[in-house]
């Protein structure tokens, strides 16, 4: 299965889904790499959102076995919104063996 987010300021992430503190750690980490208030050349005021989405990526390939996603015990699939809230779309394509 292929999941694609056709937006340049949102991303698809596979990561731990148990400890909510990890979400805050991700936010802190990405904000250090691409702070919102930096003087960027991009004129729309959301360059940090584009950079964060590019770092994480807009697509992930996942396996399905017996009708279920194959993920680690603590893994989850997340849509990361960096320029919202706004309406987003995630496309899913299931490819046979």
Where are these regions (language model features)?
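Active-site histidine-anchored catalytic micro-motif
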Residues: 1-97
């Amino acid at each position: 299965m292929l999941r694609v987010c056709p937006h340049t300021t949102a991303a698809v992430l596979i990561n731990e889904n148990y400890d909510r503190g990890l979400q805050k750690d991700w936010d802190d980490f990405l904000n250090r790499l691409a702070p919102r208030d930096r003087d960027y050349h991009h004129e729309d005021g959301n360059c940090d959102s584009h950079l964060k989405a590019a770092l994480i990526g807009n697509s992930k390939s996942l396996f399905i076995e017996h009708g279920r996603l194959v993920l680690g015990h603590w893994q989850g699939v997340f849509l990361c919104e960096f320029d919202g809230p706004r309406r987003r779309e995630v496309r899913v394509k299931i490819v046979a063996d």
